[in-house]
Design a protein with these regions (language model features):
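Generic, well-ordered alpha-helical scaffold segments in large soluble proteins
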Residues: 1, 22, 33-38, 57, ...
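ATP-dependent carboxylate/acyl-activation modules
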Residues: 1-68, 274, 293-301, 305, ...
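C-terminal amphipathic alpha-helical interaction region
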Residues: 1-4, 8, 14, 19-23, ...
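Active-site lining segments that contact anionic ligands and/or coordinate catalytic metals
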Residues: 11, 63-66, 91-93, 117, ...
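Conserved structured core elements
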Residues: 25, 29, 48-52, 60, ...
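Cofactor-cradling patches in redox/metallo enzymes
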Residues: 28-38, 42-114
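Conserved phosphate-handling catalytic cores of large alpha/beta enzymes
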Residues: 82, 86-91, 95, 100-163
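Active-site loops and adjacent core secondary-structure elements that bind or stabilize anionic groups
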Residues: 127-346, 350, 371-390, 430-431, ...
């Protein structure tokens, strides 16, 4: 890990931005740091940036490339539109780098290269972005032929995709036969919503996914030991845990992590692909409804299938929650980044993200416990979860499904605002509306719909 150094403008210039409608910036900021430390002049425009703003800055600074980032599925569509705009304005001489969790190499280097008339590259991570910029620099000074070794072969692309076969037309049923309705309906302890504050950070820390934190957020990797062998996973985690304890201690001392939850249980029914939320068990007043996509191939699943249909004569139940670590951790992380204190920024931001995920996991367990089926977990949790119990949680080895918006089974981010309205998230300082691009603020906030159906697991609807 390294602190940020000022770039040398002679090596090249790049404009970086998170695309319009997306507020995620950790990946983009990491690219900023790596490129700056390797001598590039980086113009980081921030989040929710329109293509017009990127173009204006690129022309102003005579940028050698534009880098676009985005975490959301819909951001991939924004990127496509941005490439069209660059074409229409005759700016296809500007190389473009695309990165983000929703992108794949095949989508960028095969599909989107058919859209953009200029040079387009996929940045799997910050270091691949650096390699692309280095090679573009070699092209500019004549050390490398244009695109020499930079365009993947069909064989290389094939390694990154599943072979595609022409789909035969199929008749899509109104419900999946996999989600049978012979399951017990668990009646919740109350209807409506409640606010929970004062949750112990020590209790939450026990639910941290150390692999996600240490490797994905903090970018640590196992080291080679003196005998030439690589650290085992246990040795690797033992080495990094003191850093985790130190970060947690500092965050507690500074009051940066304030866990809060608003959650509730509601009477619901499925109406085709819709989930109808009722005001009470009489099912006479509809509060709102959520629409979910259905798979176009077997087993034709849709989230609504996990609930009793509206014409069944029975009320079913769903839980919703919004969990947050508060605004202070995001604000402090932004200050650290602005001060070029990269290592501290990366550690604190990653901790905030994974503590929010830990809170979601912890509260999902609490909901299962209150709902009456936590004892069906392979290893029921009593007090602090064991490592075996945690591994089961992270692999969804429990009864219940927890679905968050923005993923393929429930992609509509506007539903985040519905959940915020349903639970009155303002009581825990969480906002979500068109002004926030239907993403929760503060950043370290997440929400979910929780099903009790035993077959409710993660799946992709497409």
């Amino acid at each position: 890990m390294m602190e940020r150094a000022e770039g040398e403008t002679g090596k090249g210039r790049i404009v970086l931005a998170t695309v319009k409608g997306d507020v995620h910036d950790i990946g983009k900021n990491l690219v900023d740091i790596i490129l700056t430390n390797n001598g590039y002049e980086v113009h980081n425009l921030g989040i929710k940036i329109s293509i017009n703003e990127m173009i204006e800055k690129a022309i102003e600074v005579k940028a050698d490339a534009i880098g676009m980032s985005g975490l959301l599925v819909k951001s991939t569509l924004i990127m496509r539109d941005n490439l069209d705009e660059l074409n229409s304005r005759g700016l296809q001489d500007i190389p473009v780098l695309l990165g983000g969790a929703a992108l794949t190499r095949t989508y960028v280097e095969r599909d989107l290269r058919e859209v953009y008339d200029g040079r387009l590259f996929y940045g799997k991570d910050a270091f691949e972005g650096l390699r692309v910029m280095d090679r573009l620099g070699e092209i500019r000074v004549g050390k490398l032929d244009v695109d020499d070794g930079m365009v993947p072969t069909e064989k290389e692309l094939h390694r990154h995709r599943v072979a595609e076969q022409p789909a035969e037309p199929v008749e899509i049923p109104s419900r999946s036969s996999e989600a049978t309705m012979d399951n017990e309906i668990f009646v919740p302890p109350f209807l409506g919503s409640q606010v929970i504050k004062g949750i112990s950070l020590d209790d939450l820390a026990a639910y941290i996914n150390e692999t996600a934190l240490f490797r994905n957020q903090w970018q640590f990797r196992p080291e080679v030991l003196p005998d030439g062998t690589k650290e085992t996973d246990a040795q690797f985690k033992d080495r990094i845990r003191p850093t985790l304890r130190e970060q947690l201690s500092e965050a507690k001392e500074q009051g940066l992590l304030i866990p809060q939850v608003v959650y509730g249980f509601y009477a619901v029914n499925a109406d085709g692909n819709d989930l109808v939320v009722w005001s009470d068990e009489t099912r006479t007043v509809e509060l709102m409804r959520f629409n979910y996509p259905r798979q176009s191939a077997e087993p034709f699943l849709c989230i609504a299938d996990f609930f009793r249909p509206i014409d069944s004569g029975e009320a079913d139940y769903a839980a919703f929650h919004i969990v947050t670590m508060g605004a202070a951790v995001s604000e402090r992380a932004a200050e650290l980044f602005a001060e070029n204190r990269y290592q501290e920024y990366l550690l604190l931001h990653g901790l905030g993200v994974e503590m929010a995920e830990a809170l979601a996991e912890f509260w999902h367990w609490r909901i299962r416990e209150e709902w009456g089926f936590a004892d069906q977990d392979p290893e029921p949790i009593v007090g602090t979860p064991t490592q075996t119990a945690l591994a089961g949680l992270f692999r969804q080895k429990y009864r219940s499904g927890r679905y968050s918006w923005g993923y393929p089974a429930c992609p509509d981010l506007e539903d985040n605002a519905k959940v915020a309205l349903l639970l009155d998230s303002s009581r825990i300082g969480v906002e979500c509306d068109e002004e926030t691009s239907f993403q929760y603020q503060p950043e370290q906030t997440t929400s979910a719909l929780i099903c009790h159906h035993p077959r409710a697991k993660y799946f992709v609807a497409k």
